[in-house]
Amino acid sequence: MKSLLFKLSSILLLSLSAFANNEIYITQVGTSANLKLDITQDGDDNVVNLSFSHDDNTVTIVQEGEDNYVGYTTAWGSGQAWGGDLDGSDNNLNIKQYCNQTTCGGDRFEFHIQGNDNDVDFFQGYRVDADATLHQTDSFEAGGHFIRLDIHGSNNTYLGSQRSNNAGHEHSNISNIYGSYNNIYARQEGNQDKSLTLTINNSNNDIDIIQKSSAAHSATVTLSGSYATDLDLLQQGGTAQSYSLTQTCTNSSGCAVSVTQGI
């Protein structure tokens, strides 16, 4: 085994006089040099605390503005405080966090992943479509987003984004995914608070969830069962919407749910 431990205070490749109080802390444990890591920070008080294990992990992190955070845990496999922990191989993460205002509400991305071949692309301050098309940022992006991932298993894919264009409005996404071969897309955007709690714990689900527009929408989704579920949920409009699903699919052909609320 080998260990790589380093800590950088201030922005990478920029002078301390221009940007201060950025911090990067990375612990790598493994037997291979195939880890790829690309980090860009621009602004004040951005923090990347990260730990790795095993081979072929690819992580790209871009943080702009101020008060962004990615995630960290000091104990393998514990998910301590649901902070960052990659303990597997062939994981791919692409994380962007963005704020273009003088004062940012803070974007957070906390994760604990234990397994192989996970692909997590999550954008805060941006909009991304289900086909991975990345749109331009809002002209007024004040941050205030939060997501916590806990992915155990292999070959999961997770794509999503959170953004708003007014200060004081926050989005949150708490996710637990323990099964394999799930295809998940989640997008929250627009003014007013949006919240989503997703728990899957089985395999081969196809999930698309969008919450948008200028109202406070919330969704709680719990899936499980012997067979997969195809879920499409859209909540929109200026009236607050709420949706909760607990699904235990026992149909050998799979289950399908499609819900649209608001106009």
Across the structure, where does each feature detected by a protein language model lie?
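Extracellular/surface-exposed low-complexity segments
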Residues: L4, L16, T260-I263
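Sec-dependent signal peptide recognition
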Residues: K2-L13
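Low-complexity repeat regions of mature extracellularly deployed or surface/particle-associated proteins
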Residues: N21-I263
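Sec/Tat signal peptide C-region and signal peptidase I cleavage site
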Residues: L14-A20
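N-terminal hydrophobic targeting signals that begin at the initiator methionine
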Residues: M1-K2, N22
